[in-house]
Amino acid sequence: MNGYQISKLTVLCFFVNFVGAKAVAQESEDFDAAAKYQTTCFACHGTGQAHAPVVGDIIEWEIRLEKGLETLLQSTINGLNGMMPARGLCSDCTDDDLKAIVQYMIDESQ
């Protein structure tokens, strides 16, 4: 490939990524936290895999909530101690989507 072809490819990739990001943002308006939890988070938070707090375990969630919801959300976004992957491996989730999922798990654990 010459420089011109690489440049066209770069622009195309940027455009596709930009359009995809806008589509994700639009889809988030109708976001279903419970459904996304089932497809993305349940493998760990439904079973305790990798020491994840299990949804419904009041004590485990209370321990985490003592640090505050914002700290819990930042751990979700950035990952934690190599156990919790960044964004919970939900690459199509916005920060607001992740917050909704965290709130769903908290609500189900009280």
Annotate each language-model stretch with its function.
Residues 28-32, 56-59, 63, 67, ...:
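Residues at secondary-structure transition points
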Residues 40-47, 101, 105:
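The canonical Cys-X-X-Cys-His
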Residues 31-39:
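Local sequence-structure signature of Cys/Sec-based thiol-disulfide redox active-site neighborhoods
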Residues 43-74:
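Gly/Gly-Pro-rich "capping" loops immediately C-terminal to redox-active cysteine motifs
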Residues 54, 75-100, 105-108:
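Axial heme c-ligation environment in periplasmic c-type cytochrome domains
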Residues 1-31, 102-110:
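Post-cleavage N-terminal segment of exported redox proteins
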